[in-house]
Swiss-Prot record:
Pfam families: DUF1308 (PF07000), DUF5614 (PF18474). It comes from the Eukaryota. Belongs to the UPF0415 family. This is UPF0415 protein C7orf25 homolog.
Amino acid sequence: MSAYSMLSDRIVMAKELIKRAESLSRSRKGGIEGGAKLCSKLKAELKFLQKIEAGKVAIKESHLQSTNLTHLKAIVESAENLEEVVSVLRVFGYTDTLGEKQTLVVDVVANGGHTWVKAIGRKAEALHNIWLGRGQYGDKSIIEQAEDFLQASRQQPVQYSNPHIVFAFYNSVSSPMADKLKDMGISVRGDIVAVNSLLNHPEEFQLSESESDDEGQELLQVTRVDRDNVLARVAFPTEIKVDVCKKVNLDITTLITYVSAMSYGGCHFVFKEKVLTEQAEQERKERVLPQLEAFMKDKELFACESAVKDFQSILDTLGGPGERERADVLIKRISVVPDQPSERALRLVASSKINSRSLTIFGTGDTLKAITMTANSGFVRAANNQGVKFSVFIHQPRALTESKEAFAVPLPKDLTDDSAH
């Protein structure tokens, strides 16, 4: 293939990848964190290729063997093949085995955070030789990178379990390397190819021009990867085995939302209070109770004494008869535990968003190793800003409204029918 033909193909590929990356970013409600960064990296590659096309940059085959574009394509394809992608090109901080602060870029974070994917576009030959110490100075082998991923993942638990790591190879991986990764607990995706025994005449194994891939002569070694001998083709694991947390800690906002008349059909009103009218409109668009029920299903429910006490106090003041009845039923399903905030929760500095009650509730969930259900996203963000990340399930809030219905204006019947539950 001529250089100009290769250039044309690369430009087409870059344009297609930009469209796919933009579509990917739109595929999740609220977008995918890092989606804009991925698109901008692809656009930068396209811009560079177009400069070459316009004659502003001298055409070189090394430019066209763009490892950047190959890697970015691998990221897009990985994200397209996974469920619940929450971010791409996500940077995590961690402490290495020597106690030094490091950062790690995870190409795709999927399955709600439970899966970390490293997408690898380099060829199996190059990866294998780097692993054997035959790469260029400073090249880090895939196995060394895997150790970094494991170290970082242990420091970034999601719902109290470490993310599962997948290394996705888009230009194959040698069988010995794949075996080593599996032994380390890392899943491998891609073609696993054989490695031939020692060659008596390394010069027999010459690379075509299209296989140069920036590695140059480093591939002329005494062992070779046999790309044609594919031992296994491994797709992305359809189900990543994750120790799903079965404990749920209920915040006051969740207790209120769960029993609110608004969550049980009482959303067809215009209330005197603007915030209640807005919540009713949200409820007509998207019911919150089914989301709570689905998350709570088959899980053990907890609430700390402070949460239950304050919930009962709010009920006594604002709750209607139906809301109080539902509260009695709900409390019987819950194990009420003493307040026991975790040490890291107690280290939080008080602010407008971090008060002692929220600190106690979220901190008790942390001690229980439970996921805290809450509508208090402000506290979660404020704690995160102080470096404390709680395991949470965030939902929209619903206030106690049964006693307010008598003073509210019912919506016309045609509007009620259009948005009926």
